[in-house]
Amino acid sequence: MMRSHYCGQLNESLDGQEVTLCGWVHRRRDHGGVIFLDVRDREGLAQVVFDPDRAETFAKADRVRSEFVVKITGKVRLRPEGARNPNMASGSIEVLGYELEVLNQAETPPFPLDEYSDVGEETRLRYRFIDLRRPEMAAKLKLRARITSSIRRYLDDNGFLDVETPILGRPTPEGARDYLVPSRTYPGHFFALPQSPQLFKQLLMVAGFDRYYQIAKCFRDEDLRADRQPEFTQIDIETSFLDESDIIGITEKMVRQLFKEVLDVEFDEFPHMPFEEAMRRYGSDKPDLRIPLELVDVADQLKEVEFKVFSGPANDPKGRVAALRVPGAASMPRSQIDDYTKFVGIYGAKGLAYIKVNERAKGVEGLQSPIVKFIPEANLNVILDRVGAVDGDIVFFGADKAKIVCDALGALRIKVGHDLKLLTREWAPMWVVDFPMFEENDDGSLSALHHPFTSPKCTPAELEANPGAALSRAYDMVLNGTELGGGSIRIHDKSMQQAVFRVLGIDEAEQEEKFGFLLDALKYGAPPHGGLAFGLDRLVMLMTGASSIREVIAFPKTQSAGDVMTQAPGSVDGKALRELHIRLREQPKAE
C-alpha cells in the first residue's frame, strides 16, 4: 500500500509516529520561509509542514500547486497552542514532512474547490470528477454508502434475499414513457428498461422466495423536476404471507433504525393518516406535518353569496372552497400577497382571496379585504371562528375545482410555512393509507392511482360496479412532505387482476399481449404478497439536507436528461443503425 493512513484519520494518538499520506494538494501556503500544504483525500484534510532544513524536499514542496497528486512521508506532531484548527478532524496535529513525491501534476481547475457557490451547475456537471473532490460532495456520497449498507444489513438480518431482476424487459404501460432498446436479433422489436422491478418481484413471490429485496436501478423517460432523474435507484422490497400492518412495521423499523444509526435521530412511532383526510387538511397526499397550517372547508357558508367566485364552486359537487389561516401575518404587504397570487396561479388557481384580521371586536370594520363586502357578517364570523382566526392573522381562500384548490392551497401552505419560518420540528415521518384505487382523467377514463397490480379492499364484482368508490390496500411513507416510498398488497387472484384491467380499459387481447406471463403465473398458486419501494436518491437527499437529488448522485443527468460531461446521448453511426434495422427520418429544418 502506498499510504499508511488517510488524512482524516490522523489524531493526537499518533503523535511522534511516522505516516505516509497520499492525496491532492488542497491548498498551499508560504509563511515566513515555511511551506504548509493542506493535503486532501476521501477522509478529510491534513496539514503538512516543510521547513528549509530539508532543502531537497523543501524545493519540491515549493514547486507543487493546487490539485497536484502527492505522496508524503513525515512525522506526526501536536500543533502549538493557538495554531489548532477546530474545523478540521485532524486540526490538533500536523505532519512534519521529510519526503515528498509528486505522483501527478494538475492544470488549474476550472473552479476553486473551496469557493464554489457562484459556479453554475452545468460547469460543475461538466467537470463532475473535480466537483466530487469537494469535501461536502464527498461527504454526501459517503453518507449514501452508509445508508445503503445499513439497509442491506437490516434486510439481510430479517431474512430478505438480495435477488437481481432483468434490466432488459418488455414495454408495459406503467405510467411514464419507457426507455426503449432496439433488438438486433428481433428486427422491429424493442426491449424496455425497467421503470421498476414490479412484475419480476411479484413473480419471485409466486416462485416461493418469500422475502426479496434489491437496490435496483430504474428508468423513466419523463420531464425532470428537482427530485427526478431519468435513471434512479430504488430500495425494492417484496414479501409473502404478510399483511399491510406487517409490511408497514418491518419497513418503518428499518427507517427508524437507519436514522438512529446514521444521523443519531430517534423517531417515535409514525402516525397514520387516510388519503381523504390528508387531502382535506393539507391539500396533499404527502403532507409536511412540520408546518402547523391546515386547510378548512368553508363552502357551506358561501353557497348563497352573490360573489360567483365563491358561490360557484361552493355549489359544485366537484368544487371546493377552503380557507388557510396564517397566524400573525396580517402585516403582510400587498406585494407579498401579489407574489403568492402568482404562485398559486402555477397550480391553476385564478386568484387568491384574503382577509386580514386586524381587530375582530370591531366586526367587519376590523377586517381588511376586498371580499368582505360580498359575505354576510354572520357567515364571516362562522368562517373566522372555524379557522380559529384572531387579531393579527391573515386568511387566504381557494375556490375552484377540488383538485385545483388542493394543489394551490396545499403548495401555498408549504411556501408560506417556509417563508415565515413556521416549521415546528426538523423531522415529521408519517404513513398515508386508504388511497383510492383509481383517479379520473380529464376525458372521464380511469387510471390506477398507484399501479394496476395493487389490491383493492373489495370484491371483483364490487370493483367493477363502482370503481370510483374503491379503496386500495396501498400505503405511502412520507417524510417532511416528500414521499419516501410507496407500496401495497398486490393482487394474487387472476379474476381480480382481470377485473382491474377491465376497469382500466385493457381488453383481454391487450391483457394477454402485455401481461400474459403475469396472468399465467397467477394460475399456479400465487401467495398473498405485498411490498414497498423506497426512492434511495430522495432518502439520501433528505438525510444530507441537499437541495436536489443531483447533489447525491455521483454522475447525474441535467434537467434536460443529458450528460454534459460525456455528451450523452450521442449519435450512432450508420452501420450500427443498419444492424439494428433502424433508419432515421430527417428532421424538418427550422425556418
Curated annotation (Swiss-Prot):
A cellular-component GO term for this protein: cytoplasm
Chain positions covered by the region annotation Aspartate: 198-201
Subunit structure: Homodimer.
Gene3D superfamilies: Bira Bifunctional Protein, Domain 2, GAD-like domain, Nucleic acid-binding proteins
Name of protein: Aspartate--tRNA(Asp/Asn) ligase
UniProt: ATP binding residues: R220, D221, E222, Q229, E483, G535, L536, D537, R538
UniProt GO MF annotations: aspartate-tRNA ligase activity; aspartate-tRNA(Asn) ligase activity; ATP binding; nucleic acid binding
Annotated gene: aspS
Keywords: Aminoacyl-tRNA synthetase, ATP-binding, Cytoplasm, Ligase, Nucleotide-binding, Protein biosynthesis
Chain positions of site Important for tRNA non-discrimination: H31, G82
Keyword Aminoacyl-tRNA synthetase: yes
Entry's localization field: Cytoplasm
Catalytic activity: tRNA(Asx) + L-aspartate + ATP = L-aspartyl-tRNA(Asx) + AMP + diphosphate
GO biological process: aspartyl-tRNA aminoacylation
One Pfam family cited in the UniProt record for this chain: tRNA_anti-codon
PROSITE patterns: AA_TRNA_LIGASE_II
NCBIfam families, per the entry: aspS_bact (TIGR00459), PRK00476.1 (NF001750)
Organism: Pseudomonas aeruginosa (strain ATCC 15692 / DSM 22644 / CIP 104116 / JCM 14847 / LMG 12228 / 1C / PRS 101 / PAO1)
